C-alpha cells in the first residue's frame, strides 16, 4: 500500500468516521474514486462539487489533511484545523494556511529545504527525503492530536 492508502486504511476503519477526498486532475480523480470504493467510510468529492459546495462541506469537518496546496487555503477560509504535509516547500516561505497552527505542520527539517519557492524543481538529491521521511504514523499521530 502507498503511504496515502495506509493512512486511509487506518482512519477509515474508525467507527463514526467519514473521510472526504478532494482532488483535481483526471488521473487523480480516478485514484480517489478507487480508494472510495476500496475503503469504508470514504467518499470522493473530486470533480463533483462546486467550490461553494466544497467550502460548505469543509466547514463541517473536524480536520483537513492536505499537502501544501489549494485545499489547505480553502480549509483555512472556513476556519477548520488543517494538518498540512510539506516537502520541497516550507511554510515559512509564506504559503502556510491563514490562521493555521504551526504545530499542525508535518515536515522533515533538511538543510536543502526549501529547494524551491513553490515546489516546481526536481530534488537535486534524487531521494525526495523531505517527503520520504514522513511516515503514515506521523500523519495519523498529528490527526489524532487535532481530533482528540
Regions found by a protein language model. Give the residues of each.
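Donor-binding and catalytic core of enzymes assembling or modifying cell-surface/extracellular glycoconjugates
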Residues: 1-88
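N-terminal non-cleavable signal-anchor helices
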Residues: 32, 147-148
